[in-house]
Amino acid sequence: MKYDVVVVGSGVAGPTVARDVAKAGFSVLLVDKKAAIGTPKQCAEGITIEVFKEFDIPYDKRFINREIYGAKIYSPSGYTAELRYKHVSGVILERKVFDKMLAYYAAKAGAEVLARTEVVDVIRRNGKIVGVRAKHEGEPLEIEAKVIVAADGVESTIARKAGINTYAPPHEFDSGYEYEMLIEGYDPDLIHLFFGNEVAPRGYVWIFPKDEDRANVGIGIASDHPQTAKYYLDKWLKENNIPMRKILEVNVGLVPVGGFVKELVKDNVLVVGDAARQVNPVHGGGMKEAMKAASIAAKWIIKALEEENLELLKNYSEEWWRTEGPRMEKLLKLRKAMEKLTDEDLDVFVQLVSGTDLEKLAGGNYLEVVKALMKHPKVLMSRRRLEILKALL
């Protein structure tokens, strides 16, 4: 089997690359180790509304569970800050359907798609990578390709086999645990985020509504914490008198939140999405970031193939670090500052921020918010709070 491009992994990043490159007329094979693309989900399933237009994805109600109008955050002592729009700001997806449809769009664009195909190694000849070795339904398979895209998730095999350093210590990952369950008493038009060092150490509890009385209820905490994410989620549910007898699905996963892979290209191998740790460090979401990286990667793959010059692939890494890197580094800086906050700090800051401030913080445009907070008496009276905020300037 020979192709111009083989894409390993059919989550969000992989099909985006495959679709765009196939549209340009090149032969593409998209493979995924799962028997059913999109399962199991490892995601809270929330995404901003802008993604559909930006990445040319149909707004298809088949994979949209619920439209969302904003967010509400809760401090340890119960103080709240709310951001509510008059228009739809995001949606809660059905990832099992969404991921499969992204693969479908890639196939419609001309890519070939193979599920239940696990890539286990790269093929080297004369010191160069010329393809990948895989197992398709247990049978060995060799796939030759001019370009290889590692979109195979946080534990990327291909990036590592190609010699790209994707290592990160356990502390740089969050452990996620989530129930899809029946739940009442929370506005289903908003996502809800609960903070506190006893609630979710270094993370938060989320409620992402999928229906009037059904939601993804999950938690992310430091993966090296002595207690498990499940322990803290069950504890929170019990403390809030939320029954645990109507759980429809359980999902677990690791989220890379501590930094990004520096070398995104090595020779003819590109790494994108979770495999490159291209995840928003503040909230742990990675779908939009994955599609953005995939779009940049696809652009340079097309140019490299058109000009028969694989050296052009390096421009993907350069462009991502130039256009996305500064914002992502600022968000990482913000996350590290947030990790130092006590419950009292969280109470103070949630009381002081507005809904608009929340939007700016989540997007990395936080300088004016920080400057305003630094003038407030509750911050000025605390040298430690001032130092935490100053570190963000």
UniProtKB/Swiss-Prot annotation:
GO cellular component: membrane
Cofactor binding annotation: Binds 1 FAD per subunit.
Record field: catalytic activity: a 2,3-bis-O-phytanyl-sn-glycerol 1-phospholipid + 8 A = a 2,3-bis-O-(geranylgeranyl)-sn-glycerol 1-phospholipid + 8 AH2; 2,3-bis-O-(phytanyl)-sn-glycerol 1-phosphate + 8 A = 2,3-bis-O-(geranylgeranyl)-sn-glycerol 1-phosphate + 8 AH2; CDP-2,3-bis-O-(geranylgeranyl)-sn-glycerol + 8 AH2 = CDP-2,3-bis-O-(phytanyl)-sn-glycerol + 8 A; archaetidylserine + 8 AH2 = 2,3-bis-O-phytanyl-sn-glycero-3-phospho-L-serine + 8 A
Cofactor(s) needed by this chain: FAD
Entry keyword set: FAD, Flavoprotein, Lipid biosynthesis, Lipid metabolism, Oxidoreductase, Phospholipid biosynthesis, Phospholipid metabolism
EC number per UniProt: 1.3.-.-
Top EC category: oxidoreductase
Job of this protein: Is involved in the reduction of 2,3-digeranylgeranylglycerophospholipids (unsaturated archaeols) into 2,3-diphytanylglycerophospholipids (saturated archaeols) in the biosynthesis of archaeal membrane lipids. Catalyzes the formation of archaetidic acid (2,3-di-O-phytanyl-sn-glyceryl phosphate) from 2,3-di-O-geranylgeranylglyceryl phosphate (DGGGP) via the hydrogenation of each double bond of the isoprenoid chains.
Name of the molecule in the record: Digeranylgeranylglycerophospholipid reductase
